[in-house]
Each structure stands twice: as C-alpha cells, then as structure tokens.
C-alpha cells in the first residue's frame, strides 16, 4: 500500500513538474507585447502599442527606426511563416519537411525565381530609400532572430534560425507571383483538348485556335502534376478578390469610400500582417506579406489603395524540336543551338542531397524534366514574364506606399511587371482610379497564347512589350465608381488582352449594385461586401428551362417532388442565403449538365 502511495505521489509530482515546465516554456515563447526591449541601431526611442487584436501601432521619429521596429515585431509574430515563404520560391522546402517536397522544390528551383532574385538585388541602388528601408526591416528581423525566443516550429523540425537577406524578399514575392498564374494549368489542357477532339470542340468553348499554333499530343499530365505540387506548398493560395471605389457624388457624406476584399485561402497564421506606422514623413495602416517591408494594401489620411489579381497571361509554353540523333541541341531560327544546362542540388532532411539537371532554351526551362509524369518525347519550355524582365517590384511597393497623390501613385506602378494586378485607388481629394499593372505584350497576328506555341522561330514570339500607358485603366470616370472582380477588362483602342479572367458573376453583381444607388455609406458598403446574390445564375436557369421544355418529348414525366424542385428553382432570385435550397438545386443541375455535355 505504501509503495502504491509513493508511486501515485511520484506521478503527481512528475505531472506538476511537466505542467510547470510547459507553462514556463509557453511564457518564454509568447510574443512580448509590453515592457521595454533593447534594439541596437535605433537612432531614437520607438514606441510600439499593440491593440486588442494584437496589431502593432509603431511611432518613431524616423522611417529607418520605424521599419526596423516593424521587422522585429513582424518576426516575433510570424518568423516561421517568413521562413517557409522565403524557402518556397528558392526550392528549399525539402530541408524542412523531407523527401515529400523534392518534386515541389524541383519545380520552383527550375523556374529560376532564386536566380531572378539575385539579379534584382544586384540592380538595386544602395543609396535609394527603398533599399535602405528594406535593410532596416531586415535588420529588425535579424535582431529578433539573434536575441528573441526560438519559435516552436524550428524546434520541432530541427531547423536552425538563419539571418534574412534582400534576396529572401524577392523570393517571397516570386512565389506569390507564380501562385497567381493560371497558364500552367490551362494552356496544356487546351492543347490536349484540341489534339484529342479537334478545333470544332474549342469553338464550342469560345476559344480561338490559331491553326499555326502547334497541338502537342504528347504533352499530357502537367496540369494535374503542377496543381498537386502547389497543393503541397504550406502556404495559402489567392483564390479571387473583389474591390470597388465609390466617388464622392455617390456617397452620403461626399467623400470617397474604398472597399477591398482579397479572397485568400484560410490559413493560420493569416497571410496578411496588419501594422500601423507613423513618423513625421510617413504614415500608413497597411497589410504586409510575411518578410516584405512595404504594404500591398494600405490607407492613410490622404489616400487608400488595394488590389485584385489582373489574371493576364504572363506565362507562355513553347514546343521544342531537338536535333535528330543529338538531344543536346534544339532548333531555333533555322539553327541548332545547344541547350543551356545547369546542375541543381536540393538538400533533403534526413536524406542524401538530390542532384538534377535543368535544360533551358531561349524561352526558359524545359518542363518535361521538372514535372513527373510528363511525356519526354517533345520538350516543352516555359517563358515567364517575372523572370524574363528586370524586376522593380520592391521599388514600386516603396513608391506607392509613399505616394502623396494620384499622379505620384500612378507613376509608381509601371515597375510592376508580374504578377498582373488590378490596383485600386481613392483619395481625400475625391479622386478614384483603377490601373492594370503588368508587362503586357504584342504577339504576331493570329497567335493565341492559350495554346502551346511553336518554339522553332520568331513567328510566335513576343513582338514587343507595351508601354504602361496602354494598360487598361479608369481614372475618375463619369459614372463615379471603379471596380474589379478578376474579370476581363474592356478593349483599349480596340485591343484585347489575353488572360484567364474569371466569369462575370461577381463583377456583374458589383456593377449592378453600385449603379443603382447614390447614397452609399460605410454601413451599406459593409453589407455589400457580404452580399450573396448571383447576377448571372438565374439567367442560366431560364436557359436550362427553355432547353428542357424544347426537349419535352424526350423527358419522362416528372414526379411531384421533381415538379416542386423545378418550381423552386424557377422562382430563384440568385440568393445564396443559408435557408435557400434553390441554389443547391441549381449547382447540382449545373454539375450534371456540364458532365453530360
């Protein structure tokens, strides 16, 4: 009995010690939201207040001090997120998570994001404000790495904390740019459809097919392969966005109202990091990406800006003809050129490093050797604007975050080549605007970038990049509002821009609501953000019903339940309220219609 008592007492003591150790560890790991923290390199004291949501409000007498403090508090809240994001574009996830991520690393390493980042860093002017504030931000991150507690994720994965550098900012932006792209999912699929079913099938899909564009029957599998690789990435994807800016003539108080709702997959921690910074020369309440110093969405007392994805086509695929008997050369402009070959190494946790070769043409990397499951017979190379053109995105983000007015803001946008963005703007002077930022380009007549192109010569090459002034935009339109929902822009000077724009459903609803009302206020705009009515699907119901009635002789008699379902869906107003059943019936109907047709 005494022995049992001793055992029980021992177990209780051990349990208490474990609990105490856990509480001490938890307290050690908790971010510091009160007290004083010594941070070397500050010129003066910086005050940081955290509100009830944990959002930092940073007050400093210089921008350099403010951005250094931002880097520190950003790191104490999100260091592991920063670590993961900087590794994705560089192809270094396998170092953290092991062999399961090798193919994902191979994809991103081969895309050339890391190499493009190195070039961008080399081109930065070290005397520029964008460079100096970026370095101040990185100094803050690295100060936390040196003196702050180690996040538990580093301990669990056995990962050593290492200092951040400028290249990491670009690698994070590069991953985000690729995650927004759609061509790698769509172009091969359309080429495969043409190969299997012919051009008539594509006409039914409202896709223009250029007979000069090659249909590559051997290029099968990459869509699913790349999609599955992206799904393994431990970071959420952008899945669409809404934004609108209402001019002073359509609001109750005569001031501009700005609304932006980026649709990003749920994640913990969230993609955005909110922070408010105030100095004598700078103030913004902004939303930052992990590891990026300047906000992508922000507002201050003078202006507000935000974004949606433009969805333009900035990735092209080119078929490549190899020399008979010599797979080390390919045909371009009637010459046989050697592939540029680079050896890459992927470090893998608890395993030997993986070495592989990346072959490149004048267009970019050969994808067949990168994505498992792709037929090797005909090489396909990928040309991506992000890595092809000089990248000035960091400078542009600095300039838009420091803009004093609309002209200043607009002039800052031309350096954003990829990803394509719809940048929304409103200011206290009553100006509203929308600009599409992207490096758009001309192609030869009749060439469609929605298919795999002929890479043997210049007949399907980019002719030239268009000046930013020719990009779609709208500044202070007479109807007094601008909006974007990832929808296609109207032609500019008769010119359309190829892209993977989303259906008009959201855009049409936004336009209908904005057009019908002239007394908007904060409350009504907030209600609009959560609107759940489709402006398109009720019209589709009418077409479905018309088609069904035209085939009445082929349709068996309906049961009472079926007839009630028909009546329910016919009276549907497009609402997706929780108690609404017609919306569920519509999508079930739509599913079988698409499946069978």
Regions found by a protein language model. Give the residues of each.
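N-terminal Sec-pathway targeting helices
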Residues: 1-17
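Substrate-recognition/specificity elements adjacent to catalytic centers across diverse enzyme folds
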Residues: 20-257, 262-265, 281, 286, ...
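Short helix/loop capping segments that flank catalytic or ligand/cofactor-binding pockets
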Residues: 59, 67-68, 254-255, 266-269, ...
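Second-shell loop/turn segments in exported
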Residues: 66-69, 116-132, 383, 394-400, ...
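Ordered core of a single globular domain
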Residues: 390, 404-410, 417, 495-597
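Hydrophobic alpha-helical segments
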Residues: 418-517, 593-595
């Amino acid at each position: 009995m005494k022995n049992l008592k001793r055992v029980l007492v021992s177990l209780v003591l051990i349990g208490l010690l474990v609990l105490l150790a856990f509480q001490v560890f938890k307290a050690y790991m908790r971010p510091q939201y009160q007290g004083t923290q010594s941070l070397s390199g500050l010129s003066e004291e910086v005050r940081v207040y955290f509100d009830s949501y944990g959002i930092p409000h940073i007050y400093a007498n210089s921008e350099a001090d403010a951005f250094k403090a931002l880097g520190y508090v950003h790191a104490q809240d999100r260091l592991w997120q920063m670590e993961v994001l900087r590794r994705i574009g560089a192809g270094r996830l396998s170092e953290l998570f092991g062999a399961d991520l090798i193919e994902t690393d191979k994809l991103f390493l081969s895309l050339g994001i890391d190499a493009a980042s190195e070039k961008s860093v080399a081109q930065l002017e070290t005397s520029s404000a964008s460079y100096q504030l970026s370095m101040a931000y990185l100094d803050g991150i690295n100060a936390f790495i040196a003196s702050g507690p180690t996040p538990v994720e580093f301990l669990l994965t056995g990962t050593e904390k290492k200092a951040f550098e400028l290249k990491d900012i670009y690698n994070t932006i590069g991953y985000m740019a690729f995650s927004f792209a759609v061509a790698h999912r769509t172009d091969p699929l359309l080429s495969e459809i043409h190969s299997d079913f012919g051009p008539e099938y594509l006409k039914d899909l409202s896709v223009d097919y250029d007979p000069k564009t090659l249909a590559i029957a051997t290029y099968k599998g990459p869509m699913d392969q790349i999609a599955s690789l992206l799904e393994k990435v431990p970071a959420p994807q952008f899945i669409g966005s809404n934004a609108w800016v209402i001019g002073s003539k359509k609001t109750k108080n005569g001031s501009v109202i700005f609304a932006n709702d980026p649709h990003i997959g749920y994640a913990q921690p969230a993609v955005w990091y909110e922070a408010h910074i105030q100095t004598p020369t700078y103030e913004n309440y902004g939303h930052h990406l992990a590891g990026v110093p300047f906000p992508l969405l922000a507002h201050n007392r003078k202006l507000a800006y935000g974004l949606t994805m433009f969805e333009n086509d900035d990735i092209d695929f080119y078929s490549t003809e190899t020399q008979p008997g010599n797979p080390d050369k390919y045909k371009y402009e009637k010459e046989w050129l050697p592939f540029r070959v680079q050896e890459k190494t992927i470090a893998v946790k608890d395993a030997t490093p993986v070495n592989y070769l990346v072959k490149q043409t004048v267009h970019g990397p050969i994808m067949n050797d990168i994505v498992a499951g792709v037929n090797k017979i005909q090489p396909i190379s990928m040309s991506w604007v992000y890595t092809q053109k000089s990248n000035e995105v960091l400078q542009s983000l600095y300039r838009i975050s420091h803009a004093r007015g609309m002209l200043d803001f607009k002039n800052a946008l031309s350096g954003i080549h990829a990803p394509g963005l719809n940048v929304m703007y409103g200011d206290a002077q009553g100006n509203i605007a929308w600009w599409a930022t992207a490096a758009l380009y001309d192609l030869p007549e009749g060439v469609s970038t929605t298919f795999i192109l002929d890479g043997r010569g210049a007949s399907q090459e980019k002719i030239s990049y268009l000046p930013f002034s020719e990009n779609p935009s709208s500044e202070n339109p007479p109807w007094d509002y601008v909006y974007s929902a990832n929808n296609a822009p109207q032609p500019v000077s008769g010119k359309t821009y190829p892209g993977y724009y989303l259906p008009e459903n959201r855009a049409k609803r936004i336009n209908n609501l904005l057009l019908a009302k002239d007394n908007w206020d904060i409350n009504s705009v907030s209600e609009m953000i959560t609107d759940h009515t489709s402006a398109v699907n009720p019209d589709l119901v009418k077409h479905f019903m018309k088609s069904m009635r035209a085939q009445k002789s082929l349709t068996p008699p309906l049961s009472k339940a079926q007839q009630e379902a028909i009546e329910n869906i016919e009276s549907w107003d497009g609402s997706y309220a929780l108690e609404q059943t017609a919306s569920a019936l519509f999508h079930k109907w739509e599913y079988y219609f698409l499946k069978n047709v």
